[in-house]
Curated annotation (Swiss-Prot):
Pfam families: 7tm_1. The gene is C5AR1. GO terms for biological process: chemotaxis; inflammatory response; mRNA transcription by RNA polymerase II; phospholipase C-activating G protein-coupled receptor signaling pathway; positive regulation of cytosolic calcium ion concentration; positive regulation of epithelial cell proliferation; positive regulation of ERK1 and ERK2 cascade. It comes from Cavia porcellus. One of its GO terms (molecular function) is complement component C5a receptor activity. This is C5a anaphylatoxin chemotactic receptor 1. Disulfide bonds join 104-183.
Length: 345
């Protein structure tokens, strides 16, 4: 799926068929078939699921800071899901690209934009939760919708910059033997470019966030449980589930990216990794549809989900109540909620 042009004397990867010989019949590999099935499911679940989350959170964004965070997460996931039909057409037709050079640069790159946007937004949410615990008075005075939207805007801009190599190095490639057009990532003849991109992607998009967010939520969970702040604990648990799913579904993609960048196309490791790459990319796409499922499961028990509409369940999870009347003391309730005069958490 993620095609990279290959030169005879460097280590850039290629997803062109393994040679064109007489009587060779092209067909989808088992890995491609699995990838197609996964992507179809992701599209069918992710588009309506994320569209519903966008609708619910957009209605609540003026009153609840949490709604702003989850609105941007859902928008990033929805954007990636909407590109899937075109990518599916290319995959089913053995990576033949029908849609021109501009679409080649933009559409396959959306998954990387999603990766960086998601992890940066999750880091922003984590910082927000941490500030609510460590500096509740500061949050009471300065935490508001304008600051939240500014933080989300910065996350999107930084994600665009981090994913820009994919936009810059993607192009269409005409295969002379098969007379097909492929959408490829061409790093040229300098292997260091591909390795640098893969390394930055691994460090910025995975390892550093994994370490920092693990430490952050270990502290937050211990703090909320010790104070029995049930409402805040529920929000933290939802975010922990979203963060965990991100790392689970992106891990295979990161591993294959490093292996393909550091091994010769002639090596057995490279060939075996390449055979799994389409599945790993599709597996990463699952992260684009899993969040709405997490929100619904976290909303209520099974009976509650039967009795209440999906928008009500999502609204309950993605926004937080204002001040609990049973905890009027600000010192005892800053983890749970903020006072009535401030925006809801």
């Amino acid at each position: 799926m993620m095609v990279t042009v290959s030169y005879d004397y460097d280590y850039n990867s290629t997803f062109l068929p393994d040679g064109f010989v007489d009587n060779y019949v092209e067909r989808l590999s088992f890995g491609d078939l699995v990838a197609v099935v996964i992507m179809v499911v992701v599209f069918l679940v992710g588009v309506p699921g994320n569209a519903l989350v966008v609708w619910v959170t957009a209605c609540e964004a003026r009153r609840h800071i949490n709604a702003i965070w989850f609105l941007n997460l859902a928008a990033a996931d929805l954007l990636s899901c909407l590109a899937l039909p075109i990518l599916l057409v290319s995959t089913v037709h053995l990576n033949h690209w029908y849609f021109g050079d501009t679409a080649c640069k933009v559409l396959p790159s959306l998954i990387l934009l999603n990766m960086y946007t998601s992890i940066l937004l999750l880091a922003t949410i984590s910082a927000d939760r941490l500030l609510l615990v460590l500096s509740p008075i500061w949050c009471q005075r300065f935490r508001g919708g304008c600051l939240a939207w500014t933080a989300c805007g910065l996350a999107w801009v930084l994600a665009l910059l981090l994913s820009s190599p994919s936009f810059l190095y993607r192009r269409t490639h005409n295969e002379h033997f098969s007379f097909k057009v492929y959408c490829v990532t061409d790093y040229g003849r300098d292997i260091s470019k591909e390795r640098a991109v893969a390394l930055v992607r691994l460090l910025v998009g995975f390892i550093v966030p994994l370490i920092t967010l693990t430490a952050c939520y270990t502290f937050l969970l211990l703090r909320t449980w010790s104070r029995k702040a049930t409402r805040s604990a529920k929000t933290v648990k939802v975010v922990v589930a979203v963060v965990s799913s991100f790392f689970v579904f992106w891990l295979p993609y990161q591993v294959t990216g490093i292996l393909l960048a550091w091994h010769s196309p002639n090596s057995a490791t490279y060939r075996n990794t390449k055979a799994l790459d389409a599945v790993c990319v599709a597996f990463a796409y699952i992260n684009c549809c899993i969040n709405p499922i997490i929100y619904v499961v976290a909303g209520h028990g099974f009976q509650g989900r039967l009795l209440k509409s999906l928008p009500s369940v999502l609204r309950n999870v993605l926004t937080e109540e204002s001040l609990d009347k049973r905890h009027q003391s600000f010192a005892r309730s800053t983890v749970d909620t903020m006072p009535q005069k401030s925006e809801s958490v």
